[in-house]
């Protein structure tokens, strides 16, 4: 049983590190001073999709911010499932209202606070 608990803790740590890496990316789409981070975040997501088992990914450039597409075909006869989401976040202003630096996630008790 202790081996299972050790492995579970190792996996938890690994996944938390990956999540925190993502939460640290200041992908604020509404503020042009963060635009380079939108590209950084798109690339990060594309790589994570591949690591998670997607067969392929593509980043589509647009007049705005990039679109990240990932595909996993298990069987062409199966129905297509679309997962649509966004990877941008709200602007951190006003900074004086934050209890800790924005884009520096912390764990309080059992909750993750991406602040």
Q: Model-found features: residue ranges?
A:
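A non-catalytic alpha/beta surface segment that caps or lines the substrate-entry region
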Residues: 30-78, 82, 104
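Homeobox/homeodomain signature
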Residues: 9-18, 58, 77, 93-95
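Active-site metal-coordination/substrate-binding segment of hydrolases
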Residues: 78-115
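Tryptophan-centered motif/residue detector
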Residues: 22-23, 38, 69, 84, ...
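Short secondary-structure boundary micro-motifs
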Residues: 4-6, 11-12, 42-43, 54-56, ...
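N-terminal capping segment at the start of a domain
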Residues: 2-5, 9-40
């Amino acid at each position: 049983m202790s081996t299972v608990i050790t492995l579970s803790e190792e996996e938890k740590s690994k996944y938390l590190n990956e999540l925190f890496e993502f939460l640290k990316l200041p992908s604020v789409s509404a503020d042009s001073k963060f635009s380079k981070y939108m590209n950084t975040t798109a690339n990060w997501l594309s790589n994570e999709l591949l690591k998670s088992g997607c067969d392929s990914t593509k980043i589509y450039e647009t007049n705005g911010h990039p679109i990240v597409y990932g595909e996993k075909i298990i069987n062409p006869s199966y129905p297509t499932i679309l997962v649509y989401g966004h990877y941008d976040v709200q602007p951190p202003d006003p900074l004086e209202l934050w209890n800790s630096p924005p884009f520096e996630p912390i764990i309080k008790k059992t909750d993750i606070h991406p602040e």
